[in-house]
Curated annotation (Swiss-Prot):
This is ATP-dependent dethiobiotin synthetase BioD 2. The gene is bioD2. GO terms for molecular function: ATP binding; dethiobiotin synthase activity; magnesium ion binding. Catalyzes a mechanistically unusual reaction, the ATP-dependent insertion of CO2 between the N7 and N8 nitrogen atoms of 7,8-diaminopelargonic acid (DAPA, also called 7,8-diammoniononanoate) to form a ureido ring. The active site is at residue 38.
Length: 231
């Protein structure tokens, strides 16, 4: 059984967190135990409990087990620390150990990335290098907006060039007024080398909703049944 997935996006703010939430909820509804994992979270805020990131808290809220925050988000960076101009080395061993620990506890771990596939960490390395090291299959979130076809095709090509399998994509309608939505979905369906596994409509406060019904796990049926996928 394939245990771990990495969620990337065509850009920043395209809905990786709400899609991760939807996938976690869909898997949980199918009877699986799940955990969300946000290895590096930028723009975190200081709280009485320590540094916290709103996206990581969403993942924590839909995980099957009651896990400490640090198990969901081992590296929480403040707004200042998130800048590539701020030298803050990333402990990739810590990220790997955290992922391994979660993988031992649940059936599936949904790993949410930071920014897009080539978004740089503070050490000027993309998180995708760690994803390649961990050999995680990739699900892509496409924020449906002007220019998203180009961004989606470039992201899919970059994932393939890195030797990882793109096992599916999710359309997230982030612009309710966008014309030609259906045509964009049709073109992406024809051009992307992976199946469309879900469409999320535009929903206010989506991070607080039940979203599992928008994910078609049947499109991942054969993928979920194997231990590893080759690109």
């Amino acid at each position: 059984m394939l245990k771990r997935f990495f969620i990337t996006g065509t850009d920043t703010s395209v809905g990786k967190t709400v899609v991760s939430r939807a996938l976690l909820q869909a898997l949980a509804s199918s009877g699986k135990s799940v955990a969300g994992y946000k290895p590096v979270a930028k723009g975190s805020k200081e709280t009485a409990e320590g540094m916290r990131n709103k996206d990581a808290l969403v993942l924590q809220s839909v995980s099957s087990l009651e896990l400490p925050y640090e198990a969901i988000n081992p590296i929480a960076l403040s707004e200042e620390e998130s800048s590539v101009a701020h030298s803050c080395p990333i402990n990739y061993t810590l990220l790997s150990n955290g992922l391994a620990s979660l993988s031992d506890k649940v059936d599936h771990v949904v790993v949410e990335g930071t920014g897009g596939w080539r978004s740089l960490m503070n050490d000027l390395r993309p998180l995708s290098e760690w994803v390649v090291q961990e050999q995680l299959p990739v699900l892509m979130v496409v924020g449906i907006q002007e220019g998203c076809i180009n961004h989606a095709l470039l992201t899919a090509q970059a994932v393939a060039n890195d030797g990882l399998p793109l096992i599916g994509w999710v359309a997230n309608r982030i612009n309710p007024g966008l014309a030609h939505y259906a045509e964009i979905i049709d073109v992406l369906g024809k051009k992307l080398p992976a199946p469309l596994i879900g469409e999320l409509p535009y929903l206010p406060r989506a991070e607080q909703r039940e979203l599992g019904q928008y994910i078609r796990l049947s499109m991942l049926g054969s993928v979920l049944a194997v231990d590893r996928i080759m690109a």
